[in-house]
Swiss-Prot record:
Native source organism of the sequence: Microtus duodecimcostatus
Full protein name: Cytochrome b
Keywords annotated in UniProt: Electron transport, Heme, Iron, Membrane, Metal-binding, Mitochondrion, Mitochondrion inner membrane, Respiratory chain, Transmembrane, Transmembrane helix, Transport, Ubiquinone
Binding site for a ubiquinone: 201
Function recorded in the entry: Component of the ubiquinol-cytochrome c reductase complex (complex III or cytochrome b-c1 complex) that is part of the mitochondrial respiratory chain. The b-c1 complex mediates electron transfer from ubiquinol to cytochrome c. Contributes to the generation of a proton gradient across the mitochondrial membrane that is then used for ATP synthesis.
Membrane topology: Multi-pass membrane protein
Comment on bound cofactor: Binds 2 heme b groups non-covalently.
Length: 380
């Protein structure tokens, strides 16, 4: 068995990636989220495949086909809710995975980090297009509002929006192409994940101390396969409780009303995992400025290696920056809350304050805190 594992051209790749991979001996449960994201992706592709067998991407029948899946298909309701709540679990794991990377300075592995940012954009695009497919009120108006933001681009904006729509409004052509992209993107994401892992295995994993761990490595299997299995059990438990007991808790009731271009919902808002970015978008009165802030709210992650001023990699031994980090986490929670609120006093000013705080912490306060810590510890 050992000979096959180490000599077979295909199996040896798996062996070097998941079995004999040298891993730091001290990585904590925060390093579980990579494998959990892989599990989420597998769940989404499988459930999505079964949904696609019964779904029709036509404005006249899309809503009815989703109803048909829930009522008439064997375990269709389960597959549909697993897919919908699987997206939420996916984003929870994604945010925790990125948060771990920021906390422990994993962004210094630049290729891996940048590939991760591309993956984040790809997953967000996939989730957005998936939300349009049930063709409920929030699907239609969400698609209209978000795609319309591209009209803020000078000169080509309006043409670009009509090109994406395939007409003069969100209609049949839009739904069909969104379904096509929503179907193909997860497979592109899977390929990008392999590139992400390829870059990661060039350098090896980071660890909670932020120090070089070459002198103290252990094989990935059995130590971290068993550890990941615990994470899988916890994730599946939370996932099934959410899916079976509270399937609609994260959804919007408006999406149970068929799409109607003639009536606008009282509050147009995206799914909860986009609310922080939506709040940043809305906090700027100018349309183009808002769109740029929206893109920058994610793209700012790419600047983190350039903004790293500390002589230490992780925040483990850096209490000042730690404080900034947890204020940033609280700020993101405030932005998520604000994104779901109507545009009126006092939510407008809270959203603007939280948006300024978000960019200030990442671009100004954390780099300054790093320099202060260097001086305190005489590291310069």
């Amino acid at each position: 068995m050992t000979i096959i594992r180490k000599k077979h051209p295909l199996i040896k790749i798996i062996n070097h990636s998941f079995i004999d991979l040298p891993a730091p001996s001290n990585i904590s449960s925060w390093w579980n989220f990579g494998s959990l994201l892989g599990l989420c992706l597998a769940i989404q592709i499988l459930t999505g495949l079964f949904l696609a067998m019964h779904y029709t991407s036509d404005t006249a029948t899309a809503f009815s086909s989703v109803t048909h899946i829930c009522r008439d298909v064997n375990y269709g309701w389960l597959i549909r809710y697993m897919h919908a709540n699987g997206a939420s679990m996916f984003f929870i794991c994604l945010f925790l995975h990125v948060g771990r990377g920021v906390y422990y300075g994993s962004y210094n592995m630049i290729e891996t980090w940048n590939m991760g940012i591309i993956l984040l954009f790809a997953v967000m695009a996939t989730a957005f297009m998936g939300y349009v497919l049930p063709w409920g009120q929030m699907s239609f108006w969400g698609a209209t509002v978000i795609t319309n933001l591209l009209s803020a681009i000078p000169y080509i904006g309006t043409t670009l929006v009509e090109w994406i729509w395939g007409g003069f409004s969100v209609d049949k052509a839009t739904l069909t192409r969104f379904f096509a992209f929503h179907f193909i993107l997860p497979f592109i994401i899977t390929a990008l994940v392999l590139v992400h892992l390829l870059f990661l295995h060039e350098t090896g994993s980071n660890n909670p101390t932020g120090l070089n761990s070459d002198a103290d490595k252990i094989p990935f299997h059995p130590y971290y396969t068993i550890k990941d299995l615990l994470g899988v059990l916890v994730l599946l438990t939370v996932f099934m409780i959410l899916t079976l007991f509270f399937p609609d808790i994260l959804g919007d009731p408006d999406n149970y009303t068929p799409a109607n271009p003639l009536t606008t919902p009282p509050h147009i808002k995206p799914e909860w995992y986009f609310l922080f970015a939506y709040a940043i978008l809305r906090s700027i009165p100018n349309k183009l400025g808002g769109v740029l802030a929206l893109i920058l709210s994610i793209l700012i992650l790419a600047l983190m290696p350039l903004l790293h001023t500390s002589k230490q990699r992780a925040l483990t031994f850096r209490p000042i920056t730690q404080t900034m980090y947890w204020i940033l986490v609280a700020d993101l929670l405030v932005l998520t809350w604000i994104g779901g609120q109507p545009v009126e006093y006092p939510f407008i000013i809270i959203g603007q304050t939280a948006s300024v705080t978000y960019f200030a912490i990442i671009m100004i306060l954390m780099p300054i805190a790093g320099m202060i810590e260097n001086n305190i510890l005489d590291l310069d």
